[in-house]
Design a protein with these regions (language model features):
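GGW-centered surface loops in extracellular recognition modules
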Residues: 12-46
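Intrinsically disordered, low-complexity Arg/Gly-biased segments of eukaryotic RNA-associated proteins
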Residues: 173-175, 182-183
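Glycine-rich (often Gly-Gly/Gly-Pro-rich) flexible segments and glycine-rich loop motifs
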Residues: 124-174, 188-190
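Glycine-rich, low-complexity segments
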Residues: 1-26, 154, 158-172
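Acidic, low-complexity glycine/serine/threonine-rich segments
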Residues: 82-147
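Glycine-rich strand-loop-strand elements at beta-sheet edges
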Residues: 26-34, 45-103, 118-120, 180, ...
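A short, polar/charged loop/turn motif at coil->beta-strand junctions and beta-hairpin connectors
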Residues: 17-23, 36-39, 56, 70, ...
């Protein structure tokens, strides 16, 4: 599904309440941004979140001011969330979220979030590290497992899993994900 929007088109999307002098355009799917000025005052681009068993990382967030706009419409790609784990949890990881992109000549790319680590049922003492992404995924496992790294300027690292089968929380735009708790089943904060 695609759609076009206009900077002077008012509010498109859910629950935006700008002041009378501000114009907000929200994209929840791919489309084109049709400009009415040569510079956008503020652009926020967020990548899709990572899938999880341990905490999936949030998509990276970019905020820029006074970004130059071309004379034509600007393509917008909205990153999807990552694919979840297979139902049997035997071997396959979840996937990272997809990147979101504003523009093509001088694109702003927000990196998708890292997947959360997991414990395969066939080997409960194994561990899987969280994936790197816009914000890193939390580690998963009954042995300590590393967190995924966040992208500098976009998000924070995930939290590490502990040796008590507690998975780490996914990283976010504001802080690192928490390490897994010291009791099985209690994961870290995301």
């Amino acid at each position: 599904m695609s759609r076009s929007s206009s900077m002077n088109g008012g509010i498109i999307g859910a629950d935006n309440t700008p002041s009378p002098s501000k114009k907000i355009t929200t994209f929840t799917s791919n489309g084109c941004f049709n400009r009415t000025a040569t510079t956008a005052t503020v652009i926020v681009v967020a990548g899709g979140g990572g899938a999880a068993r341990g905490g999936g990382g949030a998509g990276g967030v970019l905020i820029t001011e006074c970004h130059p706009l071309p004379a034509s419409s600007v393509p917008v790609t909205v990153g999807a969330g990552g694919a979840r784990y297979a139902g049997d949890c035997t071997s396959s990881n979840a996937t990272n979220g997809s990147n979101s992109v504003f523009g093509s000549a001088t694109p702003l790319t927000a990196t998708g979030g890292g997947f959360g680590g997991f414990v395969p049922t066939a080997s409960p003492t194994a561990q899987r590290s969280g994936g790197d992404g816009g914000s890193g995924g939390g580690g998963g496992g009954c042995n300590p497992a590393d967190d995924g790294d966040g992208t500098a300027g976009q998000g924070f690292d995930g939290g590490a899993a502990t040796g008590s089968c507690a998975r780490g929380g996914g990283g976010g735009a504001g802080q690192q994900g928490g390490a897994g708790g010291n009791q099985s089943g209690f994961g870290g904060r995301g």
